[in-house]
Amino acid sequence: MLPHTISEIISGLRDKQFSSREITQDYLARIKRLNPELNCFITVTEDLALSQAEQADARLNAGQTSVLNGVPLAHKDVFCTEGVTTTCGSRMLEKFVPPYESTVTRKFIDAGAVTLGKTNMDEFAMGSSNENSYFGPVRNPWDTERAPGGSSGGSAAAVAAGLCAAATGTDTGGSIRQPAAFCGLTGLKPTYGRVSRLGMVAFASSLDQGGPFARTAEDAALLLNVMAGHDPMDSTSALNPTEDYTSALAQPLAGVTIGLPKEYFSNQLNAEVEKALQEAIKVYESLGASFKEVSLPHTELSVPAYYVIAPAECSTNLSRFDGVRYGHRCENPKDLEDLYQRSRSEGFGDEVKRRILIGTYALSAGYYDAYYRQAQKIRRLIKNDFVSALNEVDALLCPTTPDVAFRLGEKTSDPVQMYLEDIFTIPASLAGLPALGLPCGFKGGLPVGMQLIGNYFTEARLLNLGHQYQLNTDWHKRSPALGE
């Protein structure tokens, strides 16, 4: 069996139990065997991975190593990778090969990590089930008839199925945390601006944030150590200094106060999911943490506000895909208008078109004040709610999703039902706060996820809370059988 965690791989490489090439070959063989069913990867970079693994082994033998040297990872296909196709799960970019490397993937290359490939995703990161991909849906490895979550479903399913040690994702309204919950993983959405967006194809620029998928909070801390930091090439990148996110993992929880937002424990929450959360609360209490009920009164407005702001930003960001400069171009256009119309009609899927139309409507002259400006005012109220609550407590504990993974096709005919899947993840995104998703139980053989939300730039505290919980539970150690 492959080692499950980055920490185990680091130890194995250091102790010469295996080489980076050997472990990379094992992962590539597993991808060949399981990816045809799960559809986690859009592109597998076998030659690149083996070359990087050999270089990592050479560095290791020369004593020139770094923390992630030789560790095989996968990247969501929204990060530009020089010389490697970056599709964003869309026909529009099916053949797009970026001429440069994103900051995130560049940092992992510089850290010595091995790139196994690019993972499947909802088209342009728009979706909550990974059913919107031009390259077909991803299947949840816990039950292949169910969704892995979205939009980073390929990354989540790949890590859960053991096709890679960890993976990158992006989170606009829950696209790391929701798949982490559905697939039984640890997933971190950092504070907005903590991770560079350079080379991360934009969906909603004021919300998009890159982050890691891993099996443990400790692994997520190791990954964030590489990903985080100011990037002068990204105008939204935070100037706040980074830290060693592993340094506080062992800190005891005595004296920590955790808030329970009463609006999240509502009748929308499945009873068995709530029971799992109550058991998690007991674990934290046994570790010395105390709990306090808090209120986030504008929570119910988060989904409608988000589905004005995010589509508005997407409608402007995706205007660049016009068939002229790059991306899909229709055949034999009769004039410029025909080129624009047919290239975009052919290149974009239904959900992307829906959101472009919603966003264009919200930004139109007659409706800008009624919709977009109002949504931004609500966003400020939601942020103020969090600021007030987090002045009283060290972090918030709440569900990630209302229920466990739903069946493929179950919600595709009703966009509103699909949008409501993000009801517990969107608020932290609108506020720009860091949030950590963790597995905390099972319901009917499917993972249940919980979410820890912290104040700005308190990722180390969230990872400490996650690590201490995982030292005292084993939910994160469970893996889907996959016929093994």
Swiss-Prot record:
It is an enzyme of class 6 (ligase). Heterotrimer of A, B and C subunits. Belongs to the amidase family. GatA subfamily. Keywords: ATP-binding, Ligase, Nucleotide-binding, Protein biosynthesis. InterPro entries: Amidase (IPR000120), Amidase_CS (IPR020556), Amidase_dom (IPR023631), AS_sf (IPR036928), GatA (IPR004412). This is Glutamyl-tRNA(Gln) amidotransferase subunit A. It catalyses: L-glutamyl-tRNA(Gln) + L-glutamine + ATP + H2O = L-glutaminyl-tRNA(Gln) + L-glutamate + ADP + phosphate + H(+). It comes from the Bacteria.
